[in-house]
A protein has these predicted regions:
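Short, acidic, small-residue-rich periplasmic hinge/interaction motif at the N-terminus
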Residues: 27-29, 37-42, 69-75, 85-133, ...
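N-terminal periplasmic "start-of-domain" segments of outer-membrane beta-barrel proteins
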Residues: 38-55, 105-137, 161, 190-201, ...
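Short acidic/polar hinge/loop motifs at secondary-structure boundaries
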Residues: 57-60, 156, 184-223
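N-terminal periplasmic accessory domains that precede
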Residues: 90-94, 140-143, 167-168, 180, ...
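Short, polar/charged loop or turn motifs at beta-strand boundaries
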Residues: 120-145, 165-172, 203-209, 256-264, ...
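Extracytoplasmic beta-strand/coil segments of soluble accessory domains associated
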Residues: 124, 144-190
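Outer-membrane beta-barrel translocator/receptor signature
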Residues: 200-203, 214-217, 228-239, 244-313, ...
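Face-selective signature of the C-terminal outer-membrane beta-barrel domain
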Residues: 352-371, 412-539
Length: 539
């Protein structure tokens, strides 16, 4: 008899554990039922579809705390948690619109949810990752130049513009274009342009090239002034880089392009880019997406030898400022007129975690390390209009002169190197129905910095005489930005009320280089300067 009672108890317990159900409805944000929506218990494969009234039921659910997600074409997927008891559970979904008639929904230029390009009050363009990848270009700035109307990027070979490309939109400077990442303001570069077109002189824009192309899920471009919403730095428009957020999958991409050989035999350089994107789950309710890229873009030049170069001079000294003139590539000329060398590593992370039904924590950012190099104008021995020699001892003419020709008998071509480091981090929390008042909120903090280190080699400072170095640390530039944001949105049917507050701090730092790069040396006393070639005193 005891065995029979025990058997009946086990059967009843089994029925209690595995015969529970979840029921509810799936509707859109306006309360209309969604027929045929998929409702699934996360991680189990159990699921159901909603009927014409939007109702659904999932049976055989294990009691306890579980997560359920609902999805429907053209709407955002929603994931909710519920405690399943002996009596089952009820769970109701309200899905926001994410696409209408195949159109993408945009978040740039509006604070209202579900806004498509057709409904946007301003012209906006959208480019998905497939459009960007088909360019086959490792440089994101170059990719955007080829895709975005009225966006221009000019390659320059002077000063820091060789390392941070000058951009413009609608004919306005680069710092009139606001660059966002996941709708958050991106920091500006450390370079204040003073080379190139007059339009960009004094401009300080963001360096878009620090973001790997493989990390971008979608690009939104607002080609109109948006200063009322974003501030005065959005006069020319807004570019919003939406990062990938998939929680699974691995993608590798390698591109290689070879430049054609010129009639003078120069050419054949290869541009190589290797990139990867990895999506990983962050527990059962989040994601971590990581992207990385390494690119090699060599210096390009198709010019022949400089007409004023001395016989036998092949360019710059790759042995870092010594007299070994044979230690150069055979194709080097005294000056290069083409694209500077630019190599770099770039990485991005994007993470999100559903903390509760209506609250999500998020974090994203980037780290990049780049290197570039290009040549200045040729300093030709004996043909310079500048001071070429100084007396070693102004009180003893028999001591002779010191000339830069003693170090560089065939002349020299200075080389400028730029080492850029870029870092940004954004952390925040967003949710819906704050305090039960129906207010959507987004609290975030961000930090971004761009550091540009300059190094000059194959040169000298004549005022330091024979003690002059040949290579110089000439100084660094740094831009730092810190932001604290609180955004609130209160949807009221067709009316949308948005308000918020922001605290922002910006720092610009200039670090001096080594003293020989900027300080006059002991031979700089004006009345002792003498140009032996011109036969004149400078004093």
């Amino acid at each position: 008899m005891k065995k029979v009672v025990l058997l009946l108890t086990c059967l009843l317990t089994t029925s209690f554990l595995f015969a529970q159900s979840i029921s509810g409805t799936v509707k859109d944000s306006d309360g209309n039922p969604l027929a045929g929506a998929n409702v699934e218990v996360v991680g189990t494969g159990q699921g159901s579809s909603s009927d014409a009234s939007g109702s659904y039921m999932i049976t055989g659910v294990t009691p306890g705390l579980i997560w359920v997600k609902a999805s429907y074409i053209g709407h955002k997927t929603q994931k909710l948690s519920v405690m399943v008891s002996a009596a089952g559970a009820n769970l109701y979904f309200s899905l926001a619109i994410s696409a209408v008639a195949g159109e993408g929904v945009y978040v740039t230029g509006t604070r209202a949810a579900g806004r498509t390009a057709m409904k946007s009050p301003t012209p906006i363009d959208g480019f998905d990752d497939m459009v960007l990848r088909r360019q086959g270009n490792g440089d994101l700035t170059e990719t955007l130049k080829n895709q975005v109307p009225s966006f221009n990027a000019t390659p320059l070979t002077g000063d820091g513009s060789a390392f941070v490309r000058s951009t413009s939109m609608r004919g306005l400077p680069s710092d009139n274009v606001l660059v966002l990442t996941n709708s958050k303001r991106r920091h500006r570069s450390a370079l204040i342009a003073h080379f190139g077109s007059a339009m960009n002189v004094g401009a300080q824009g963001s360096d878009i090239g620090m973001i790997p192309s493989i990390a971008i899920k979608r690009l939104e471009v607002l080609r109109d002034g948006a200063s009322a919403q974003y501030g005065s730095d959005a006069i020319a428009g807004v570019m919003n880089l939406i990062l990938k957020d998939n929680a699974e999958g691995v993608e590798f991409q390698v591109t290689n392009g070879t430049w054609m050989t010129a009639p003078n035999g120069r050419g054949g350089e290869a541009d190589v880019t290797a990139a990867a994107n990895i999506g990983m789950p962050l527990s059962d309710n989040g994601f971590l997406n990581v992207s990385a890229e390494y690119s090699v873009r060599p210096e390009l030049s198709r010019g022949t030898q400089h007409l004023s170069a001395n016989d036998g001079y092949k360019g710059w000294d790759t042995s870092w400022g010594t007299d070994d003139k044979d230690n150069v590539d055979n194709w080097q000329t005294a000056m290069n007129w083409g694209r500077p060398e630019n190599n770099g590593f770039r990485s991005v992370w994007n993470a999100g975690l559903q903390v509760s039904d209506n609250v999500e924590a998020y974090s994203f950012g980037n780290y990049a390390d780049t290197y570039g190099e290009y040549s200045f104008f040729l300093r030709d021995e004996g043909k310079s209009g500048a001071l070429t020699a100084i007396p070693l001892n102004p009180n003893d003419p028999s001591a002779g002169d010191f000339s830069w020709g003693d170090t560089y008998p065939l002349g020299f071509t200075p080389r400028l190197e730029g080492h850029g480091t870029d870092f940004s981090s954004v952390t925040g929390v967003r949710g819906e129905n704050l305090g039960g008042f129906g207010v959507n909120y987004d609290f975030s903090t961000s930090y971004g910095t761009h550091y540009l280190h300059y190094y000059l080699r194959n040169s000298l400072n004549l005022s330091w005489g024979p003690n002059s170095p040949h290579n110089f640390e000439i100084g660094d530039l740094q831009q730092e930005e810190t932001n604290w944001n609180a955004d609130f949105i209160y949807p009221m049917g067709d009316l949308n009320v948005a308000f918020g507050a922001e605290w922002r701090e910006e720092k610009y730092i200039m670090y001096e280089g080594q003293k020989e790069s900027w300080m006059p040396g002991p031979w700089a006393t004006v009345h002792t300067l003498y140009d032996s070639a011109a036969g004149a005193n400078y004093g």
